[in-house]
Amino acid sequence: MLKTEKLKLVSEWDKTFPQSEKVDHKKVTFVNRYGITLAADLYKPKNASGKYPAIAVSGPFGAVKEQCSGLYAQTMAERGYLTIAFDPSFTGESGGYPRFMASPDINTEDFMAAVDFLSVREDVDPDKIGIIGICGWGGMALNAAALDTRIKATVASTMYDMTRVNANGYFDSEDREEARYAKKQSLNTLRTEEYRKGEYSRGGGCVPLPVPEDAPFFVKDYSEYYKGRCYHKRSLNSNDGWNSIGCMSFMNQPILKYSNEIRSAVLIVHGEKAHSYYFGKDAYENMIKNSKYTSNKELLTIPGAVHTDLYDNPDVIPFDKIQKFFKENGVG
């Protein structure tokens, strides 16, 4: 039996969305191959029996399972799936030290560890497992799909490519060697300072407060979600953010390099008006470029939708389409 960390899990319902009367819910844990114990919420249809198709959900990058990944998981459970929404390593209720770090390798492994966990459950059909990655975890989901042949279908919703945005800045505005070098210099200077002090500083959260009047719309959009209607005390984006050096390894470890070798089905869902739309469009184009596996790949553009509409707006998130996609591709 794999050794697990002892986690402190909250017993009461503390999600940012109402609890459904149509599903059963409980907390579970599982361990990844780095020995980090992950905390998850498991949802399944009430009065369930037999083996179910299963879906693992995570994201956004810096969020917790009590926010929109849990909403996705609970909604898909209402539609007949056994689902889990998990906190990534180093965040939320999951284990891993130091806290508030991110890693393209470990975070991809988190998804694969979720598949491990689901595959051996007696109430799951191991041949019918899919994943959903939201925002920055959309890119991680594609990377997991490129590596894990057990994943039958993948949905990337309102996705980011975290390696691209860390290396190039928003809208590729820093896509120059000198800009990247300056960023590396700054981060490595900070590494030395913080190692000397023996503690890590925090990056300051997803958005500043108060939000400047001239801030871009997407910054205000994030603020309304993370600081407003879906604030959660364990969410990095709702509070003090990642460690200041927590995401630096994303700068030179591109996670989508082999996406055109994904043989299983992929649905990328993005809002037409989202500031992040270019991530989804480009990820789709790169996935089908010079690929032999294009027939089961799809980009779904939601007219008029902005980035966080696909976080928690039930009138915008295309759950009917997502359910149909999974069923048509072996997860249902």
Please describe what each predicted stretch is:
Residues T4-G50, Y311:
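N-terminal cap/lid segment of alpha/beta-hydrolase-fold proteins
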Residues K51-P60:
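Short beta-strand element of the alpha/beta-hydrolase
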Residues G62-Q74, P88, G280:
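The serine-hydrolase catalytic nucleophile loop
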Residues M101-E122:
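Alpha/beta-hydrolase active-site loop
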Residues I262, I268-H270:
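Short beta-strand/loop motif that positions the catalytic acidic residue
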Residues A305-D315:
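Catalytic histidine-centered segment of alpha/beta-hydrolase-like enzymes
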